[in-house]
Each structure stands twice: as structure tokens, then as C-alpha cells.
């Protein structure tokens, strides 16, 4: 028995809501993945504030219909698709998918859409190679701290150097 019209409309509404919060959409070919493997992927994505949805291409097509920012996704809507919708840290979401794919070697990325632009496989890989938000914040904090430390050492060095010069002058004057 197929889905009712109300059920399909509910799914399309849910997809529209998810897409409104999504920054990046990855389209995966999930053919050959077991339920356990899909659950593993979903668990990995949950940590990164991302979600994996398996839905019919026609329902996704209806969800993106009329939304220009998602219009380019239409070209990827063929075959068996799982849609990874990344909400927050785009790099972390893509890394989670890539680590899953490297481990199971059953799923491949068909494409991705970021800010209305279809991304190539190289661009997707480049996003995965980016440091996470936390790593970037740590690097920036470290750089700021290093500058502050150098300034503090420099400020402290002026009176210390002056004291050494005076001491040397005083010792030199006694002899």
C-alpha cells in the first residue's frame, strides 16, 4: 500500500523545514547499505548537527520546487539517494560522511549543493579537509595568546635591559 496524499504532504513540509535550516546538502548513493550501516551514518551525523534523510526523489523535488537556492539539486535527483542535510559546521558534517565512506566503501557521493552552487568532488574533498570550527577557534586563540605573550615579554624586557645597563655601568665605574 502506498503513502496517502496527506502523508506525502507532511513529508514534503518536513523536508522544506529541514532545508530552510540547512547550509549544505550532500546527495549519497546508498544502494547496498544495510540498515545497521545507515544507523551508523545517522549516529555520526547527529554529533555534527546534521541529518540523513532517505526519501523519494519526487518528494524532494516537490520540497525544493520554487526555492531558487535549492533548484540546482534537481540534477542529482536520480537513482537511490540519501540526503545529508548539514545545519551547522559544514566541515564536520562532510568529514563524518567521508569517514563513513572510507570505512564501509559502499556509498559514494553523487554531489553536493552549497549556497545554491553544485560542488565538484574536489570541492567536497576540500571542505572535508578544512579544520573544524573548534580547531579554528583554538588556532586563533593560540595566535592571539602568542602575540600577547610577545608584547608582555617585550614590555618586561625594557626595564630589565635598562637595569642590566645601569648595573654594568655601575660596575664598570667602580673599577
From Swiss-Prot:
Membrane-spanning parts: none
Protein task: Forms part of the ribosomal stalk, playing a central role in the interaction of the ribosome with GTP-bound translation factors.
Lineage, broadest ranks: Bacteria, Bacillati, Cyanobacteriota, Cyanophyceae, Synechococcales
Gene3D superfamilies named in the record: 3.30.70.1730, 6.10.250.290
Domain of life: Bacteria
Any GO molecular function: large ribosomal subunit rRNA binding
Family statement: Belongs to the universal ribosomal protein uL10 family.
Disulfide bonds listed in the record: none
GO CC entries: ribonucleoprotein complex; ribosome
GO biological process, one term: translation
A Pfam short name: Ribosomal_L10
Subunit relationships: Part of the ribosomal stalk of the 50S ribosomal subunit. The N-terminus interacts with L11 and the large rRNA to form the base of the stalk. The C-terminus forms an elongated spine to which L12 dimers bind in a sequential fashion forming a multimeric L10(L12)X complex.
InterPro entries the UniProt entry points to: Ribosomal_uL10, Ribosomal_uL10-like_sf, Ribosomal_uL10_bac, Ribosomal_uL10_bac_type
Key words, A-Z: Ribonucleoprotein, Ribosomal protein, RNA-binding, rRNA-binding
Record protein name field: Large ribosomal subunit protein uL10
Amino acid at each position: 500500500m502506498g503513502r496517502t496524499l496527506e502523508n506525502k504532504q507532511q513529508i514534503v513540509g518536513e523536508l522544506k523545514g529541514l532545508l530552510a535550516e540547512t547550509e549544505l546538502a550532500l546527495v549519497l548513493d546508498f544502494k547496498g547499505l544495510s540498515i545497521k550501516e545507515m544507523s551508523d551514518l545517522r549516529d555520526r551525523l547527529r554529533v555534527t548537527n546534521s541529518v540523513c534523510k532517505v526519501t523519494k526523489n519526487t518528494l524532494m523535488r516537490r520540497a525544493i520546487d520554487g526555492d531558487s537556492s535549492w533548484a540546482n539539486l534537481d540534477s542529482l535527483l536520480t537513482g537511490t539517494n540519501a540526503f545529508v542535510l548539514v545545519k551547522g559546521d559544514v566541515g564536520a558534517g562532510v568529514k563524518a560522511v567521508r569517514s563513513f565512506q572510507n570505512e564501509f566503501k559502499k556509498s559514494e557521493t553523487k554531489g553536493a549543493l552549497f549556497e545554491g552552487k553544485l560542488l565538484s568532488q574536489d570541492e567536497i574533498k576540500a571542505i572535508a579537509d578544512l579544520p573544524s570550527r573548534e580547531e579554528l577557534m583554538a588556532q586563533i586563540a593560540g595566535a592571539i595568546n602568542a602575540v600577547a605573550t610577545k608584547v608582555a615579554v617585550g614590555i618586561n624586557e625594557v626595564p630589565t635591559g635598562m637595569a642590566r645597563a645601569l648595573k654594568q655601568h655601575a660596575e664598570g665605574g667602580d673599577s
